[in-house]
């Protein structure tokens, strides 16, 4: 990274970031019936912000770097958004610092990100530069591990495709009557036009051996549970989103994991309110389908878990051959640079 400052920080931050009021947790990409769905372009919504794109192999410290930078600013009371890896919730794919208009993202597969305007909108940081070339003696082993990892992801996507088909079937079985729910909600919420309108599309849930939700990690002023049918909930969310967009009300759409064209929840950012889908049904066929969906997502999650374990093995190989002293220096330099950057 060019023009690195000489000033250093001693990073002794303990990385515990759950349930802090100034931190929000999301997924920017998820494993779905359509493969990996990538909404990383929704991380940094600042007009003149900058995004640092991390490159480098597994085990080179990308997630740890982001955790340390994020916690440095979070422990100073600043708002920080953490974007978790949908295949390993304990790992990060990105962070966003709205006060500074800065994002740091993992730009490696499956969410490959390249600079569109280098040194203007994005800066590339290649942590792969600090991998010792002795790692090459493990080339065949790494290649075989990556092949097996890919097979498990392909299996996971097959199960998710089946689960998504049944999810869509339940959409057709649901009652579409919203009974003026949207109008009543809008009257009770009294939403105001935002001074700086922003819209994002992200995810709050992902598939593992069970459906993982980040809902409990976030602190909201209020959470409303929408308990109409699956179909009716989606209609209400679409109407709320349309109203928010037309009236320049900042909001975050949190999409469904089994069909990302539908909305699972909507967050109204200015008042820190979340409206979340808790669908109910008495339809016997829909209930039966849901049981099958649960089995299919479990099967998908079991393959994602196997892929994650393989990924950990690959990480261990690279960890042995990575110079983390250099990466610590980069982390400290980034903090120094970000402190001077203010969102415009």
What are the language-model segments listed below?
Residues 25-28, 74-132, 245-302:
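Conserved nucleotide-sensing/catalytic segment adjacent to the nucleotide-binding pocket
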Residues 42-48, 214-221:
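Phosphate-binding P-loop
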Residues 18-71, 75-90:
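Hydrophobic, helix-prone linear segments
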Residues 20-40, 188-213:
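N-terminal pre-Walker A segment at the start of P-loop NTPase domains
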Residues 141-192, 300-341:
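An accessory alpha-helical subdomain
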């Amino acid at each position: 990274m060019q023009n690195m400052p000489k000033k250093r920080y001693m990073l002794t931050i303990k990385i515990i970031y759950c349930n802090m009021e100034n931190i929000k947790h999301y997924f920017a990409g998820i494993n779905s019936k359509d493969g990996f769905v990538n909404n990383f372009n929704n991380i940094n919504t600042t007009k003149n912000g900058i995004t640092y794109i991390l490159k480098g192999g597994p085990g080179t410290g990308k997630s740890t770097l982001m955790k340390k930078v994020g916690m440095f600013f979070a422990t100073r009371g600043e708002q920080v958004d953490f974007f978790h890896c949908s295949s390993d919730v304990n790992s990060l794919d990105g962070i966003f610092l709205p006060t500074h208009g800065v994002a740091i993202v993992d730009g490696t597969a499956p969410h490959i990100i390249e600079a569109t305007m280098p040194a203007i909108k994005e800066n590339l940081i290649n942590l792969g530069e600090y991998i010792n070339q002795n790692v090459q003696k493990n080339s065949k082993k790494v290649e075989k591990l990556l092949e097996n990892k890919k097979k498990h992801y392909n299996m996971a996507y097959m199960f998710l495709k089946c689960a998504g088909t049944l999810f869509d079937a339940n959409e057709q079985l649901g009652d579409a009557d919203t009974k003026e729910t949207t109008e009543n909600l809008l009257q009770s919420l009294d939403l105001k036009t935002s001074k700086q309108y922003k819209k994002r599309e992200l995810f709050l849930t992902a598939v593992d051996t069970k459906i993982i939700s980040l809902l409990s990690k976030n602190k909201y002023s209020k959470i409303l549970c929408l308990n109409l049918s699956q179909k009716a909930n989606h209609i209400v969310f679409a109407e709320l989103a349309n109203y928010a967009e037309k009236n320049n009300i900042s909001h975050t759409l949190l999409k469904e994991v089994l069909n990302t064209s539908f909305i699972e929840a909507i967050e109204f950012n200015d008042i820190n309110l979340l409206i979340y889908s808790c669908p109910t049904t008495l339809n016997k066929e829909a209930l039966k389908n849901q049981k099958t969906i649960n089995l299919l997502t479990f099967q998908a999650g079991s393959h994602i878990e196997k892929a994650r374990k393989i990924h950990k093995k690959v990480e261990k190989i690279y960890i042995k051959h990575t110079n983390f002293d250099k990466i610590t220096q980069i982390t400290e330099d980034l903090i120094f640079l970000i402190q001077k950057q203010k969102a415009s």
